[in-house]
């Protein structure tokens, strides 16, 4: 069982653009990556909603104002894509307060802090090879929230080419040797998403 589940509002149909193939189940539509499961619940969330659940963490646990969702059972044999969730972005007005909450709830310590101008970023990894929780402190943020996610895929070039003007022109990522492309809002994914090379 993948240790992180992301619950997404709106329709799963446009997510083929990101290299995912959501499959129907009693719980809703599911798409499995190598390190996480994405869920479009049968009791549909509003478009733009993003929730997170962790294996072993009780539903309702307080992640500095973010309420953790219930971790659900997924069917055996769920086909997994060769993509992975590189990181999930949490926005906050106080980096260390939020990072302390992440550590307390998940048991995953703060690995490092990066400062870029007035923006500070803290990084936690959920399990070996797992999802990175990137906590971003910005002056214009008033409360902690889940913002969006980045999907790393070996099919990056093919997906970007197929998506055409639904994604931005690829550019160099912060990590040396990697490239990133942002999925535009008109693609209909409902939440901020970027694609990245592995």
Residue ranges, per PLM feature:
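Glyoxalase I/VOC metalloenzyme domain signal
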Residues: 1-110, 125-198
């Amino acid at each position: 069982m993948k240790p992180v589940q992301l619950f997404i509002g709106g329709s799963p149909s446009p997510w083929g653009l990101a290299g995912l193939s959501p499959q129907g189940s009693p719980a809703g539509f599911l798409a499995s990556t190598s390190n996480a499961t994405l869920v479009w619940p049968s009791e549909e969330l509003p478009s733009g909603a993003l929730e997170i659940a962790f294996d072993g963490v009780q539903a309702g646990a307080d992640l500095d104002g973010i309420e953790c969702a219930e971790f659900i059972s997924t069917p055996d044999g769920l086909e997994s894509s060769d993509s992975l969730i590189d990181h999930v972005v949490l926005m906050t007005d106080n980096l260390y307060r939020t990072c302390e909450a992440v550590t307390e709830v998940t048991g995953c310590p703060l690995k490092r802090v990066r400062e870029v101008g007035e923006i500070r970023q803290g990084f936690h990894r959920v399990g070996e090879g797992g999802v990175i929780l990137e906590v971003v402190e910005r002056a214009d943020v008033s409360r902690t929230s889940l913002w969006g996610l980045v999907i790393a895929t070996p099919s990056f070039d093919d997906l970007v080419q197929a998506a055409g003007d639904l994604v931005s022109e690829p550019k160099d990522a912060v990590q040396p040797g990697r490239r990133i492309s942002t999925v535009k809002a008109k693609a209909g994914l409902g939440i901020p998403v970027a694609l990245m090379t592995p």
